[in-house]
Amino acid sequence: MTLRSRFAQVRRVLLAAGASGALTAGLLAGAGVSQAAVMLPCDIYAAAGTPCVAAHSTTRALYAAYNGPLYQVKRASDGATTNINTLAAGGYANAAAQDSFCAGTTCTIIEIFDQSPQHNNLTIGPAGGAGGADVGANAAALPVMAGGNRVYGVDVTPGVGYRDDATSGVATGSAPQGAYMVTSATHVNSGCCFDYGNAETNNRDNGNGHMDAVYFGTLCWFPTCNGSGPWVQADLENGLFGGGNGNNPNNAGDKTTFVTALVKNNGTSTYAIKGGNADSGGLTTWYSGSLPTQGGYIPMHQEGAIILGIGGDNSNGSAGDFFEGVMTAGYPTDAADNSVQANINSVGYAFPSSVTGPIVAGDNGSKCVDNNNGSGTPGNKVQMWDCDGNTAAQNWTVASNGTLQIDGGCMDITGAKTANGTLIEWWTCNGGANQQWQAQNGQLVNPASGKCLDDPGFNTTNGTQLVLWTCNGGSNQQWHLP
């Protein structure tokens, strides 16, 4: 379940209607600071007395004055690296710099810079108790509009993860903390664990209460959960808590395209879980009350590492989209949370209605869906091949009409057949049902047959022709759109 539903409908690109991160007069009262014309999330939290100790984003600045690097990419062709900065102080990422640097090859995000004064940068995670060393995200896999600018998010697929085990200023022991991230309900799975927040410093499961991270996904740790998710939950170690002692029927999940996921914990007695549409409206408090009473959570035993896309022991089977996130010192007020949510709304996160780029295989992140030799000959095979940097043979357009287009034609199911093993080919676009594809839970499904695009036998050898097959959730049926 690792593919966002980019072309299920035409998405309107939302332009920011002006920053709305102004704090209420009540929030500012007694803060001892003057209100800037524009206050971004970490300005808001600082004014409320709970400053950011970590601020990570590949899309935008999270302080009005920040004008440094957001993330670093590494080029596959020669190993060179470059930082991607903001366009201006308090602004959005200079995605054009990435496009230019990575032209003709692929790039990986190898570091996400902390914008806070603590400098808690995230790098690719090492091996842990539950998983081998992680890999970096494909830097071009998650294009998104933010503030009217085309930028990139972090496309977390199984095996991708980031970590900092030697942080500064992050809550330890029973100190209070808040954390939020902006993610998407269109790219989730039930693997453990799409987290952002506080974790163990030795990459091991050290027991109850040693984590304090916000989780988003469809993993129901304490059945029975309300619906099928995805849910915002608190990963407090040895459990994803929807509220209380784990099971919370009031937590109905957050299913909007873009989601603000928030968890805060006073470290000694209470925690809260909130979620909301990152594009409009406020936050819903799914839970606010006692910490779990099973033992080990009252008080908490936080260790102060920071993780993204993985569990505390480096469980790295998760999938998710990450656009921005912060961690605070102290337990933020609801008023501060609400003002941060208003600022997030103003960004206008939106997926482009039609995007072009590689379709990356879920069973091997170095392989892409390829139109053999970029040929426009009907019947040309659609195959697995090494990702080669958006050449004509791999530069697919995910169109709003449900087709996957390349080289002037469409991805086609041979003869409009529905049998397992039917070959996938290039054919002139003709509006046929055998050229329709829908992204569902990480799979590319042909609605007419109800079957999935499949890499036969998990064979990622160059030249393996793709087929139609009964959907089974296997990684050989997972595809990551541009």
List the predicted regions and their residue ranges:
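Secretory targeting and sorting signals
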Residues: T2-A36
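Extracellular glycan-associated modules
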Residues: Q35, M39-C52, A76, C107, ...
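GGW-centered surface loops in extracellular recognition modules
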Residues: A37-G131, S346-G357, A361, C368
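Sequence contexts marking disulfide-bonded cysteines in secreted/extracellular proteins
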Residues: P41-D43, P51-A54, D99-T108, C193, ...
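Short, hydrophobic/proline-enriched secondary-structure or compact coil segments at domain edges
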Residues: A65-D78, Y152-V154, Y180-M181, I273, ...
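Short amphipathic beta-strand/extended segments with alternating polar/hydrophobic composition
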Residues: G79-G91, D164-S168, L283-S290, N395-V398, ...
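A motif-centric signal for short, conserved binding hotspots located
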Residues: A139
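Lectin-like carbohydrate-binding module/patch detector with strong preference for beta-trefoil
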Residues: S353-P482
